Amino acid sequence: MGQKVNPNGFRFGITRNHNAIWYADKNKFSINLLEDVKIHRFFEKLTREYQIGNTVIRRDRNNAITVLVYTAKLGSFLGASGENLKKIVEKLRKTLKNRKIVINVDAVDIQSPELNAKLMAELIAEKLEQRKSYRIAQKFAIRTALKNGATGVKTIVCGRLNGVEMARCEGYAEGEMKLHTLRQNVEYATAIAKTTYGILGVKVWVSLGEIKEKNDIDAIIRADKRR
């Protein structure tokens, strides 16, 4: 049943870290969860502008929020002397509608954006919006990822492909993709392409190889925390 489950959620706590790290009492849990949703949606809108691959939210015991934003355009995200980052934090406070909240945003550089599933999905979606062939867009993304060290890549595009009346799905896969194996280091992401014929959905799976030893799992989790 590995292919029926979100590969990210399937591996949280085993070979991947959670995207939200905090604890709250029952009376505050729903409030914190709603704030997390707003934060993720806020940075989702900035994904293409700053090439944001992931967002991790952490809270301390005083409920101060630290948001780790993984971006491939670190310089653009920070701006000159951090001015752009200050503007982003201020907009985020307005989105949360709570100016008293203590919130910090830390930017982390993505070393290999070609291997990031989210950025790959957005790249395919962007090419589809530019009226590029969905076949060429997928094959280009797959070749780029494999050339940069991925052991396997799978992509699917669904919708009114080439403007046909009936929606359908077409995808490509190269290399290994063991979604049912928890040791397999797999990243999964989705994106939306808004075209003249309607919305096209994009799904991307990127495999970075199988983790053989427990020490390797611990190393990946520690590296994920440092990123």
Curated annotation (Swiss-Prot):
This is Small ribosomal subunit protein uS3. GO terms for molecular function: mRNA binding; rRNA binding; structural constituent of ribosome. Belongs to the universal ribosomal protein uS3 family. One of its GO terms (cellular component) is cytosolic small ribosomal subunit. The keyword rRNA-binding applies. Residues 39-109 form the KH type-2 domain. Coiled coil: none annotated. It comes from Mesomycoplasma hyopneumoniae (strain 7448). NCBIfam families: rpsC_bact. The keyword Ribosomal protein applies. One of its GO terms (biological process) is translation. Binds the lower part of the 30S subunit head. Binds mRNA in the 70S ribosome, positioning it for translation. Keywords: Ribonucleoprotein, Ribosomal protein, RNA-binding, rRNA-binding. InterPro entries: KH_dom, KH_dom-like_a/b, KH_dom_type_2, KH_sf_prok-type, Ribosomal_S3_C_sf, Ribosomal_uS3_bac-typ, Ribosomal_uS3_C, Ribosomal_uS3_CS. Part of the 30S ribosomal subunit. Forms a tight complex with proteins S10 and S14.
